[in-house]
């Protein structure tokens, strides 16, 4: 709605009878439009202040969100302007400025020294001016230098390993590389602690991983009769990564999701390397599936245990429990800019232990992402590797299909998108890897395998498209998915024992 008002001004002395003395315009202030009748032949500077005063009185009860931040008390000189255009000259009249009845104007506050001139001469220059891409400055140079350190370290490590191999595999090489890795780790700590450079500290930490893992791998002696690097060296490198991750705890920026991912993956690699080293390589795929299932199905429990989120004490009737007993208080908690004012007010109104609960909740979310992602990766790798030719070919294909279905079902149970993405990626990666593996084994049936693969992919896309308008899973459907998921997991374990020959071993036991 608009509030019409008339701002009277002195009449021009030489106005002719053919030209109207007033002009009806619409003034836009925020989202409110107000119709005004203004003098047409008088310079605008003679009545602009009166017009602003009238509008201020008319719109004084208008909500602030309707005005859109418009402030009648702004400093400067008021002027009229067409929307998106420079202000009109105050020494001109509305007729001189080409303002006619029905024109839309806005009020702007300008300085008396403001001058408006075109910034560009053509469209190409305008595009160049509007391009707000960041320039290459000192910060960009620092980022480049930080990222270049681990990238250049990788080929240097490769050359050092080649020299170590060609010069008799002396222990001085891994010792020197390990000392260099420790020095870089100290540099990462110094960069984060004293120079507050998180990017450089993270780049140095990545470099430390490369150096320490290489040193640990080269320090493991080759077995007798072996002339190449193998499972013992992989186990040594994975062990170094595991202990380094436990020591750094997510690095300078507390990336706990990456730390938890590295820990679980390193444990799986160590176990697989040990199995290969002692001749139990046939058990590695089944063991990977079992370990991956354990991590994926128990990720929430592991998260609560590692994050140390304790349940509040349950008092007996009549017993009072202090709020501070829920969690240990955190000294001098500092609010971050990411928190809303409402959340900050809530935190300020409760004991300091609530801040610790918030920190633990964030840590739990990061740990859950890492656990589910690593468990899914191990599960997918085991599902592809477990398929073997021979008597258990069909059995192993059934196990891989069940694992694919389990990953697809569980992707709908997680609200965290990274967890869902990891499970969906496994749902796609397992059939793709199996198809590639079968084509390598049976190249004459490649056309049939590819046709089946593309048909299944097309059906999956149709199913996903048909569920585009399903915003959430109902409790009944969710419970059904959980039951199907549990039944499939229960079917996977016996089939794994069957494939690995455990049943045959038990059957052949003689007392």
Swiss-Prot record:
TM ranges: 144-164, 171-191, 203-223, 228-248, 258-278, 286-306, 368-388, 389-409, 421-441, 445-465, 483-503
Annotated membrane topology: Multi-pass membrane protein
All ranges on the Cytoplasmic side of the membrane: 2-143, 192-202, 249-257, 307-367, 410-420, 466-482
Periplasmic side: 165-170, 224-227, 279-285, 442-444, 504-511
GO biological process: biological process involved in interaction with host; symbiont-mediated evasion of host immune response
PTM-bearing positions, type N-acetylserine: 2
Disrupted-gene phenotype: Double espI-eccD1 mutants abolish EsxA and EsxB secretion, but not their expression. Disruption abolishes EsxA and EsxB secretion, but not their expression. Results in a lack of antigen specific immunogenicity and leads to attenuated virulence. Mutants exhibit defects in bacterial growth during the acute phase of C57BL/6 mouse infection, but survive for 140 days despite a wild-type bacterial load in the lungs at 100 days post-infection, suggesting the pathway is required for virulence.
Subcellular location: Cell inner membrane
Keyword field: Acetylation, Cell inner membrane, Cell membrane, Membrane, Transmembrane, Transmembrane helix, Transport
UniProt entry tagged with the keyword Acetylation: yes
Cellular component annotations (GO), alphabetically ordered: peptidoglycan-based cell wall; plasma membrane
Quaternary structure and partners: Possibly a homodimer. Part of the ESX-1 / type VII secretion system (T7SS), which is composed of cytosolic and membrane components. The ESX-1 membrane complex is composed of EccB1, EccCa1, EccCb1, EccD1 and EccE1.
UniProt miscellaneous comment: The structure in 4KV3 was determined for a fusion protein with E.coli maltose-binding protein.
Purpose: Part of the ESX-1 specialized secretion system, which delivers several virulence factors to host cells during infection, including the key virulence factors EsxA (ESAT-6) and EsxB (CFP-10).
Family per record: Belongs to the EccD/Snm4 family.
Protein name, entry field: ESX-1 secretion system protein EccD1
Organism (species): Mycobacterium tuberculosis (strain ATCC 25618 / H37Rv)
High-level lineage: Bacteria, Bacillati, Actinomycetota, Actinomycetes, Mycobacteriales
